[in-house]
């Protein structure tokens, strides 16, 4: 049998595919073996002696079904696992994910003025120190801290108001004292009222 390696190589170049995709008609081997140029190969392709094989379809439907099941937690038991827990999902990757989530939340709260820069820095350092397990715990801590700060501010305002009131009272007392001292030792003693004249009551006549 005549070797058709040259014709197969030229046909793959003309058809722009691999040599495995080229089909040569076994009944026309003598005519195909005479073709030694790309022009002759094109003529044979036109005549149907050389054909490009169709692409084989490799269905992914089963793979898609398996992926959907794995997202639900199926096929993930101990028997399906290859590698240690650290190899499958490193703790460093988990740490990075958690840090990014918590820091993103802190940045969002700072930009929307929900927290000031001092609280942002305090919470940022606590996040770095592994104080918060997840986003919910961080949000609860922020709300608790804000409530505590508001309570302290209310108490401080009440204390300041009380101090101001006491100070004003002391100033009034001091002013009254200075006023009394300025008037002199007996200046503020009221003059004695004249004695009231007693009306003479007529004596009752005794009955005889």
Curated annotation (Swiss-Prot):
GO cellular component, one term: cytosolic ribosome
NCBIfam families, A to Z: PRK08570.1
Protein name: Large ribosomal subunit protein eL19y
Keywords in alphabetical order: Ribonucleoprotein, Ribosomal protein
Source organism per UniProt: Arabidopsis thaliana
Composition skew (Basic residues), residue ranges: 164-175
Family affiliation: Belongs to the eukaryotic ribosomal protein eL19 family.
GO biological process: translation
Gene Ontology MF annotations: mRNA binding; structural constituent of ribosome
Region (Disordered): 144-208
Matches recorded under PROSITE patterns: RIBOSOMAL_L19E
Bias (Basic and acidic residues) ranges: 144-163
